[in-house]
Structures are given as C-alpha cells and as structure tokens.
C-alpha cells in the first residue's frame, strides 16, 4: 500500500504520449510542400512574414498567447502541417504544441534562413 502513490504516478506517466513531429532539412521540406494538400505555416511575426515567406504560407505567430486558438480555427487536422520560423527554434515549439493537439507536423529544422526555394513578398 505504501507504493500506491508511486504506482499511480508511474501509470499516469506511461499513459502520456509524447508529441511527435518530423524535423527535416530544407531539401526534404521542399519535397514535402510539393504536395498541394500540405498546409504551409509560417510561425514568425507579421513583420518577418511581410519581409518574405514561402508562397501560400499561412501566418500564425507562435509568440502570441492565442497561438493554439488561432491554429485550431485555421488549420485542418486531417492535413499535414509544414511549418517554419526564422532559424528553427520557434518552429520546434509550435510543432510540439500542434502535435500535442493531434496535428501531423513537419518542421523545417533550420528555418527560413536556410530556404533556397521561391519567396513571396
């Protein structure tokens, strides 16, 4: 009986599923977004987005408190979400949040800085 709290804690931990997402390089990311069903998502600020972004990318700033609320309003759960930020740090945060909410996510691990493809302004 004295081990019950430990066992309950262990069971709750084992019941948690880690949020999974794919983190890929720029070349692989470019191949992923060739699929027109993939949703492109820029998680940088509006100012960064205005300076240039991957064509047809939606903008949801991950630094805003309502990031997940906006994501759930705009992003379909039945489509893959391909997301990026400037360098890869914010996108990992966004990818983890989205994956925890049931989204299938592919993240550009080196960010927009490494993007060699087309840029829309």
Over which residues does each language-model region extend?
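Structural scaffold elements adjacent to functional motifs in cytosolic proteins
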Residues: 40-42
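Rhodanese-like catalytic fold shared by cysteine-dependent sulfurtransferases
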Residues: 3, 16-32, 38, 47-80, ...
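Sec-dependent N-terminal signal peptides
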Residues: 4-13
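Short, surface-exposed ligand- or partner-binding patches at beta-edge/loop junctions that are enriched
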Residues: 84
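Intrinsically disordered, low-complexity boundary segments flanking structured domains
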Residues: 10-11, 45-47
């Amino acid at each position: 009986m004295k081990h019950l709290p430990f066992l309950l804690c262990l069971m709750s931990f084992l019941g948690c599923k880690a949020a999974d997402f794919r983190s890929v390089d720029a070349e692989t990311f470019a191949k992923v977004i060739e699929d027109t069903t993939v949703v492109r998502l820029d998680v940088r600020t509006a100012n960064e987005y205005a300076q240039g972004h991957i064509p047809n990318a939606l903008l949801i700033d991950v630094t805003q408190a309502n990031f997940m609320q906006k994501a759930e309003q705009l992003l379909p759960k039945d489509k893959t979400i391909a997301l990026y930020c400037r360098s890869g740090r914010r996108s990992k945060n966004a990818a983890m949040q989205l994956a925890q909410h049931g989204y299938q996510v592919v993240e550009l691990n080196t960010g927009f800085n490494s993007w060699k493809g087309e840029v829309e302004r």
